[in-house]
Amino acid sequence: MKARYIFLVMVAGLLVSCTKAVKVTVTQEVINPCYLGNGIEWDPYDEAIPWGAALSDEDWNTLYERLDYMQPQYVRCMINSPFTYYTGKGFEDGRNSENIKKLLEYCQSRGVMVVYGEYNPPAWEMKGSKEWVEASVRHLNWLVAENGFTCIKHFVIFNEPDGNWASTNGDFAFWKEMVGRFQAEMDKYPALKGQVDIAGPDAVIDYANPASEYDAEGWLKATVENVPEVGIYDMHAYPGQRYVRSGEFEETLKKLKAMVDKPVILGEVGFKYFSDPADSTLAQEYWKRVEGHPFTKGSDCNMMVYDDFYALDMPLLLMSVMNSGFSAAAAWMLDDAMHSNGDSGRIEDIKLWGMWNILGAEVFEDPSQEEVRPWYYTWSLMCRHFPAGSKILELEGDLPENVASTAAQLPDGSYSVAFVNYGSESHPIDLKLPVSFEGYSLQTYHSGLEKKPVSNGRFVLPAQTFAIVSK
């Protein structure tokens, strides 16, 4: 496969040698002066406990090694309290805490910003209870103050409160009230007051719950205008392929960003290939793969995570995030082993969205699921080469159809420029940086990673390829 790809690149180079190069210039015009970075949803394997398959030291070391390559700049970590601090009769902070401690120890040691939170209250009837607010904040303080996990910077009190699947069922007034109550409780703890703020509204872009007075845009607008306790704005997005590739998704993000005067991040992001009629071919393939699958029913999964094109779609989506002025995005999600649908514990219907399944052999009797999937590589490059504190910059140049790009100046003064060519034709690129190319390299992904020096900014961008120029 590698030899075939090299041959195709050589042929592409000959075919485009007489084609005028696409000039792309990195300017000093700033889109975002302090990008927070790209990251991943990494939840603490709550269901491994009832599955009777605790992660081994070997599993954890594998996770750490893969994450060290990725260098996520932030992690979104959400818990289900019935698996952790809620016993069914009361509250116990240290209950089943081994996994979340290992997860947060990693983030603390690597300086990774953590957005921590709860999917829902322990029971839906507890959603407004004083006991839950006190216990939830006490558990947060236990993590931050007593265990030293100061990497936790933001707190999500309800996951996707606009949704009809949430205990809030789109009730904005109730959510607003609860934000105030949680903030008042957090202010009682010195380790939390002024150190951890609330992230919200955590609403899903392009979704509207008929039971709610607001759609997602309305949720964000109402939060900006009426919920001053929120320290960082947080949304979720699951667009389709046409929506992203057409540029419409980026325009939606720009419209949302124009409403806010603080950083806004995507707490969850991924693709749903069955929401747009234009993606019908992908939808048909999706449901074909779901049929008879041994460990998912298709109710909450993405069967395309195994494909090379997903390794192009995900960084392409990130380019829309970065170029729109948003400040971060966390991919949903790191590992299939983190959740079953509805957190029911049913191994025949897991949320198959990950870069691998670390319990593929132990729980699912399929060791091949533990192998790294293609999109891990391109997402990792977008994490490690656009670190926190980078300036996202405007590009000048007329990019060809089916090619997208984003650029940044890093905190060390160097530059990173990423490209995705999701079309069927190769293109010669003539890239101009504000500095010389000494020490820079070109990394590409097309069914595998390749790396070589780039001395003058000129290179061929093959069809169906991700590329990044960086130090």
Question: How would you describe each model-predicted region?
Answer:
Residues 16-17:
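C-terminal motif of bacterial Sec signal peptides marking the signal peptidase cleavage site
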Residues 21-63, 71, 78:
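Boundary/entry segment of secreted carbohydrate-active catalytic domains
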Residues 67-242:
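Substrate-binding cleft and catalytic face of glycoside hydrolase catalytic domains
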Residues 172-317, 324:
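Noncatalytic carbohydrate-binding groove/subsite architecture in carbohydrate-active enzymes
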Residues 271-380, 393-401:
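Aromatic/acidic polysaccharide-binding cleft in carbohydrate-active enzymes
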Residues 398-436, 464:
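Carbohydrate-binding surface patches
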Residues 434-449:
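Solvent-exposed beta-hairpin/edge-strand motifs
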Residues 455-471:
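C-terminal beta-strand-rich structural cap/linker in extracellular carbohydrate-active enzymes
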